[in-house]
């Protein structure tokens, strides 16, 4: 859960909290995965997906600033056993960002079961969270960064690391788009982010939150401390196209402060370079290639990638071991569809 509970609305209903987004190559297809509704939200959590919500994969093509392709998932209320009917609509061109557009229905199914349509394959349901991180270590990292001090792990040591998310459950939306798709052909650069929206009383839709690059919200968005501020809500409810103008100065200054004490020759320049890499908050991926979310570069994100360690290293320009490796959470993923492990 690299995103955490970032907005008041998503804290009230974690079904609308997008915690992670993944993009990687599957069996002759591009795989997109969106994670919501962590069991770590605690008592009162309602299982499944919000029947008055929408869950969207937003895709930017060829480096475009705005999305030109959307896959929208909608869910019916749960039946007695707890399953929900699912519909998937495809919206392209100007419709991709239009909440009023209906798009084209491409698949219908049921949670907990794989389903297909129009060459696509999808799975939605409860699964084991593939994300791994020791939140005790994150607390030490954030304390050091926010106080502009070296990271002091205290009594914590990498050898003692244990994932806080081990055994926790989430709800996953997994979509396979074949390489033969006219828009997502191999070799094409794309950018991916996900959004959760809720119907309004006025008949429209309100974006509750969004996610793209992992760890952005705990490391950067929450720095102000006031998640009810106008700026914070702007980042939550708007798309990422405004991120460079809105957040570059703040992110660059934060990173520059983090590396200034490590001897980087040009802290301000490094901060600007990192901000340019992170903003807009859209996960880049080249279709048909092996995904790797790494310090050297972002190319999608595989379920096994150690995103926190990469982001810590990028922000500090130094190695910050989390004590966990991909094998630490091997039981939470599989090499075949639906790639997550159903719970």
In which residue ranges do the predicted regions lie?
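Surface-exposed extracytoplasmic segments
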Residues: 1-343
């Amino acid at each position: 859960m690299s995103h955490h509970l970032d907005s008041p609305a998503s804290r009230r209903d974690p079904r609308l909290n997008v915690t992670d987004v993944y993009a990687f190559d599957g069996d002759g297809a591009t795989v997109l995965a969106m994670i919501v509704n962590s069991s770590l939200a605690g008592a009162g959590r309602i299982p499944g997906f919000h029947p008055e919500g929408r869950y969207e994969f937003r895709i930017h093509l060829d480096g475009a600033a705005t999305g030109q392709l959307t896959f929208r998932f909608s869910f019916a209320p749960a039946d007695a056993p707890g399953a929900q009917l699912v519909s998937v609509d495809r919206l392209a061109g100007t419709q991709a960002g239009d909440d009023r557009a209906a798009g084209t229905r491409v698949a219908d199914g049921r949670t907990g079961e794989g389903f297909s349509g129009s060459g696509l394959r999808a799975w939605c349901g409860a699964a084991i969270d593939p994300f791994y991180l020791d939140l005790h270590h994150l607390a030490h990292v954030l304390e050091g960064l926010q106080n502009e001090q070296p990271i002091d792990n205290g009594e914590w040591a990498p050898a003692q690391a244990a994932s806080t998310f081990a055994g926790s459950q989430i709800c996953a939306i997994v979509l396979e788009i074949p390489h033969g798709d006219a828009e997502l052909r191999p070799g094409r650069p794309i950018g991916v982010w996900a959004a959760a929206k809720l119907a309004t009383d006025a008949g429209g839709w309100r974006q509750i939150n969004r996610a793209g690059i992992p760890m952005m919200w705990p490391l950067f968005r929450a720095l102000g401390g006031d998640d009810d501020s106008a700026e914070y809500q702007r980042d939550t409810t708007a798309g990422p196209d405004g991120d460079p103008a809105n957040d570059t100065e703040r992110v660059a200054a934060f990173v520059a402060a983090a590396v200034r004490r490590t001897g980087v020759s040009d802290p301000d320049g490094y901060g600007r370079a990192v901000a340019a890499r992170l903003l807009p908050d859209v996960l880049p991926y080249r279709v048909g290639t092996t995904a790797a979310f790494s310090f050297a570069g972002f190319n999608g994100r595989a379920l096994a990638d150690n995103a926190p360690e990469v982001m810590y290293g990028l922000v500090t320009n130094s190695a910050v071991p989390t004590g966990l490796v991909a094998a630490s959470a091997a039981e939470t993923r599989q090499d075949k569809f639906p790639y997550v492990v159903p719970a």
